[in-house]
């Protein structure tokens, strides 16, 4: 058998791989310092073009070497390895046990793949091989709570100096009216057990007269600030999996405004800052802060 064409093909393959490696190395390096400052991009592209031309030429040479190879006319023989099964002394030849183990592993692989193919053909459109009759429990939705659930939740909340009252002007979603001592009033628009909006006004302002009054802001700046902070707390306490806890936490936080005009700021110790009292309440400790002092 003539081995010279094979050696030529292998040599040409090494040359081709080397030229391809130079292309990727040049692409990874990018523009180098030896390209200079003027026209460095053009020099880089020219160098890359030359390397690609070299790869193309080496590929053609490799294809010509492949065409010169002639396939063997006779099947390949195992030569002396065909007599390994006749070897009786395992200490002299340790390859035979490994071959036997490989054949056993191949037989098991073929058997298991046959079983897997049969199961996949029977369950081609199913994600599971077996039929499962259990249905996944639907997750509770906080905006689909019944009116009785809302009534029971609000009825179980009791605080001093706070009055809670539920109204349903449209017989669907509830509006929770909160009165804190003689300090302020608030309208909490609920969708099921989900808080959608909070309107805060002074104690003397109209809030229960009509539906429109429950969406308009207060004419006092201090209560508009409290309303903005209530929206922040509403988003902070929101919990789709525990909506009852979210409402309880929000009402507990909102009740801390009973001392809106009494407690000083915990940071600066002053009652007024920019003509406003401490309108912010910490979400965990409920301590009063001015909006500029809470940072």
Swiss-Prot record:
Name by which UniProt lists this protein: Mediator of RNA polymerase II transcription subunit 27
GO biological process: regulation of transcription by RNA polymerase II
Gene Ontology CC terms: mediator complex
GO MF terms, alphabetically ordered: transcription coactivator activity
Function recorded in the entry: Component of the Mediator complex, a coactivator involved in the regulated transcription of nearly all RNA polymerase II-dependent genes. Mediator functions as a bridge to convey information from gene-specific regulatory proteins to the basal RNA polymerase II transcription machinery. Mediator is recruited to promoters by direct interactions with regulatory proteins and serves as a scaffold for the assembly of a functional preinitiation complex with RNA polymerase II and the general transcription factors.
PANTHER family in UniProt: 34 KDA TRANSCRIPTIONAL CO-ACTIVATOR-RELATED, MEDIATOR OF RNA POLYMERASE II TRANSCRIPTION SUBUNIT 27
Keyword Coiled coil tagged: no
InterPro entries, per database record: Mediator_Med27 (IPR021627)
Cellular compartment(s): Nucleus
The family this protein is said to belong to: Belongs to the Mediator complex subunit 27 family.
Domain of life, per lineage: Eukaryota
Subunit structure and binding partners: Component of the Mediator complex.
Presence of keyword Iron: no
Record keywords, A-Z: Activator, Nucleus, Transcription, Transcription regulation
